């Protein structure tokens, strides 16, 4: 091969290599761009916030069932009523139990469930369910603003399990919202309380905190 042929071959190879490298870079950027878009879409799917306002808190199952949210046709409504039922339980265990059992549908509480609730509310911790109302803070002893307002929210993991919905409720005594899980009944589409993680520890009310 002559000198000029070698020079030509080298030039062609160099150009080809540069073009291939540029093409790979463009492909990588495109791939990353698509992946970023997919990740963003996944994160946004199912993200929703619903707010519920109550002029007063129900003291009996009949009062709970009289609320519009008692249709139980969305998991958000059932989650909101679960907080109200827990509040009622702190004042009247019998009434609160009736409410919770109704919200649980075909799976009423057993002895272990009742023992768990009683244990959570020991030592003056009856304020726990009230920490989920807007305006409740450690400084004001978790006293909600009026009307009683609850925010229920979902995220991209909420409907990972078919027939269930995991929602989250912001808490005035914790940095992150607390989860609650609902299950849908196939026969009528209504949503019922399945699991709740709303009674875990929160920051002590100021009047109970010796270090405040």
Question: Residue spans of the language-model regions?
Answer:
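Short beta-strand edge/turn micro-motifs at domain boundaries
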Residues: 170-211
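Glycine- and small hydrophobic-rich membrane-insertion segments that are intrinsically disordered
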Residues: 2-51
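Predominantly extracellular/lumenal beta-strand repeat domains
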Residues: 31, 51-55, 171-173
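Core segments of small alpha/beta cavity-forming domains
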Residues: 43-134
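Beta-strand-connecting loop/turn residues
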Residues: 7, 163, 187-189
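Surface-exposed, charged secondary-structure patches
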Residues: 115-173
């Amino acid at each position: 091969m002559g000198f000029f042929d070698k020079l030509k071959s080298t030039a062609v190879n160099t150009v080809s290599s540069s073009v291939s490298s540029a093409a790979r870079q463009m492909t990588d950027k495109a791939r990353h761009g698509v992946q970023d878009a997919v990740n963003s879409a996944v994160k946004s799917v199912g993200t929703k916030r619903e707010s519920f306002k109550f002029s007063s808190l129900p003291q009996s199952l009949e009062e709970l069932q009289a609320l519009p949210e008692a249709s139980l046709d969305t998991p958000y409504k059932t989650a909101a009523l679960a907080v109200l039922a827990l509040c009622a339980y702190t004042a009247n265990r019998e009434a609160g139990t009736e409410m919770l059992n109704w919200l649980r549908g075909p799976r009423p509480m057993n002895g272990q469930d009742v023992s768990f609730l009683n244990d959570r509310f020991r030592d003056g911790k009856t304020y726990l369910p009230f920490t989920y109302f807007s305006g409740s803070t450690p400084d004001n002893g978790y006293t909600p603003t009026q009307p009683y307002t609850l925010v229920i929210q979902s995220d991209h993991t909420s409907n990972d399990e078919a027939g269930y919905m995991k929602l989250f409720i912001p808490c005035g005594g914790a940095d992150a919202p607390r989860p609650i899980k609902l299950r849908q009944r196939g026969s009528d589409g209504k949503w019922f309380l399945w699991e709740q993680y709303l009674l875990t520890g929160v920051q002590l009310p100021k009047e109970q905190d010796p270090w405040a």
